[in-house]
């Protein structure tokens, strides 16, 4: 068992030091805690299973992976779970779990008072975001992916592997797959006036991401170039200011242990067909670590 983290990067440093001594790692905390753990585990020489018990204000990744909010239920699902290899992002050499972003509201998570987050939870993020509506400005960007070049001014950019960002589940286009090696990218064009801003926000809330106000695509690698330094956010934490950013998808880089469900079903079937997993008589999937364990 690892001690409780006392400060930022405390969990990261402890896992880097001794994480590979364990057969499995289980953490409890918010998205920031999960991000620290994954960053540390991406430095490991071997893939060690990760169990996650959400205990933060928003818990975007837990929502995406259908991990229960109740801690005891989440712990039970880890015990009874199957392995699921999840894509991780790489941002100019840094790792992130579920989202990299720039522009409007992306700094709300780390700019919102921790006291308010502890007291009001997700509502604290919403209140902070509303205060920023009148200060929204666009960033001139050159975006390149898969041989395509997109140039324009954008108030928001999200490169994600999640169905929930800041607790909002409708901003990301449908069809998210957590292990396909692809990001979902959403770029929100800079509105020309207050009316267009209002229309853009309404369309985002309703998940009507039309070509007039949005650019959406899937990709395994994308670059962003800007004249001015642009602040970026990684998993709700500051990712620094950059004029050039390269983001790559590290396909199936982290192994979660999750309850068998629609998310894990396809990967479980592939593992069974490859002989990496068998099904018990009651239909429960079991991972085979040593092929000699299987009797002829």
What are these model-predicted stretches?
Residues 1-28, 35, 39-40, 73, ...:
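ATP/NTP phosphate-donor binding region
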Residues 43-159:
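Catalytic core of DAGKc-family lipid kinases
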Residues 101, 105, 158-174, 238:
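Glycine-rich phosphate/pyrophosphate-binding beta-alpha loops
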